[in-house]
Amino acid sequence: WSAVWAIPILTLSHFVLKKKIKLGYLWFLILPAAVYLATYAPMFLTGHGLDIFWGMQKQMWWYHTGLKATHPYTSPWWSWPLLARPIYLYTSNEVGGFVSRIYATGNPLIFWAGLASIIVSFVYSLKFRIKKLALVIFSYLVFFVPWAASPRIMFLYHYLPSIPFLAIALGYILRRNLKLIVPAVTIALLLFLYFYPHWAGLSVPLSLDKSYYWFSSWR
């Protein structure tokens, strides 16, 4: 359902690029709906009807709007760009001084430099009237800010649809500051190699595992 927010992005992009909305663009509504319906083909082929399909949609809506639950790794929507509260997906017991985790967190450089790039790009889009850059900022926000209205518990992974636009903004800023490209890519790569065992569930010494928790909220 997160993809629903792509519809206003596609619509706005045509206005930004000064293109008229034509009848053919209705496919942006028809095709996604058809693909979504097609994913339920196995259910329909086993004899279930539209009543079951509609019941599932209502159940999903209730899950996102009415579920009352708690979780130790929940995080508010505004904290996601700060990478304030990642989430454990798996953890093992210590065996011989080694432990393995699957820890859903991001590359700190991408998250934090990306957030700074979003802010700077927003300023540039206003100052220099760069419509395409404004579209990137809008796309980033439209996948992210609506979660502020959600009553359900939320996690860092709900931020993922905004990440591609964060990366575009980061790339734009780096392109305007070419001297930063090599250091930024190098640091991002080193951080990837450093965090990879923590992301992928590889067995590591306890001393290395403890080094991953830069902040108390990461534990």
Describe the residue ranges of each PLM region.
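Hydrophobic/aromatic-rich transmembrane helices and adjacent perimembrane loops
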Residues: W5, I153-R175
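Perimembrane helix-loop-helix junctions
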Residues: W5-A33, R129, L174
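Transmembrane helical bundles and short interhelical boundary loops of multi-pass, membrane-embedded
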Residues: L12, A41, L45-T46, R176-R219
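Aromatic-rich transmembrane-lumenal/periplasmic boundary elements in polytopic membrane proteins
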Residues: A33-L83, S203-Y213
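Juxtamembrane membrane-water interface segments that cap and precede transmembrane helices
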Residues: S79-T105, L208-R219
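Hydrophobic, aromatic-rich transmembrane alpha-helices
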Residues: N93-G97, R101-I130
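Membrane-interface catalytic loops of GT-C/OST-like multi-pass glycosylation enzymes that act
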Residues: W147-L160, H198-L202
